Structures are given as C-alpha cells and as structure tokens.
C-alpha cells in the first residue's frame, strides 16, 4: 500500500508512480480531465472518485468520462492501495500477422454491427418478455442478436423484457412481474430514455456505441444514459 496517493503512468518508454495528492478527493471526471491535460494527446485514463477512495464496496473504475467498470467494487481495490488512476499513453504500433485480413474482418464486423433492421420497438418489450417467460424450454441465443437492442437503446433495452421474464430484482427478488406489471413498468420502457437522449457515443474502439448523454433540467444540464441495473435498482427493487 502506498504511503500517499499515487497514479501509475506508462507511455511505452517509462513506467512510474507519480504523486496524486492534488487529485485525492476529486471526482472521477475532474481527475480524468486533469490527467488528460497532463498526459497529452493519445492518453487514456482509468481512475476512481471519492467512493473508491473511501473503499465503498459499490465503487467502480471510471474511464472515457464516466464509463464504469462497476462490478464487485473494483474502485475500492484501487482505493485500498491509494492508487488514484492509471494513465496509458503508448505510441508503439501493434504488430499484426496479416494486416489486410485483419482489416477485412474488422470491416465485416462493423458492417454487421451497424446493420439495424426495424425488428423491435419499445412498446413490444413486455410482450417479448412475457413470451420468453411462458416458453416451456429456454433457447440459447446468439450474443450477436442482442446487438440490435444494445445499439439502439443501450442496456435499458432489457428493462421491461427482464421484468416480464422474471429476471429482474422486483421487491429485492421476492416479487415478480405481477407486482410490477406493464402498466407500472411503462416508466422504465427503453423509449422513455431515448426521448431524453441527445447524443450517442462509443467507448474507445467499440463499434457498438451503446452509450448516450441525456438532457436534464435543474442544476445539471446532462447526464450519462442510465444502465439497466441502475434503473431497476431504483425501480422495482425498491417496491
């Protein structure tokens, strides 16, 4: 454990721990902005905010202005070491055995991801979930099928689907879709979030682009589009 707050800096030529005392106490966005300005063009930052510093067991690691590695309290692991951030700024090109073949495969993948037929609409969500609930056997689904939903709405695409199929924490997992039926769960339909979404964005090198920024009124003018678990943790879980 470091005696003082530090961050790890690596640019390919050197790897070193640098003092982060001035950053300790800052939130993740403030920290990332400060380290990007210091690291220069091409830098990437993963960092924690006050929750991670205080070893909160729900603290995540933030990157790309608020995208979170949020499972299992990873932010608390960094905080326990007094590691405020990791900053990478590599310049070395990554070698590929067959660059032309890699390019073709990447382009093929991108075309598939960006192909978005109008197969599914927001109001269909509860019916799809109910259909999955009453099926006598569950079928394994190709993960690529989910890209239609994730690309359009993000993870909130599964809100009403998961409620109706029984895969949502209603009443802290003691309840069911009977307690939070379509009439009530309409407030978490994915279209409710798209109505506020003003711009989409991608995490670094991701062709899917499930992220979005939503407009708000009040003290703050915008926020990240919420994720499925956040919405339902503050919804059906609290019943």
Task: Annotate each predicted stretch with a short phrase.
Residues 1-239:
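Intrinsically disordered, low-complexity segments enriched in small residues
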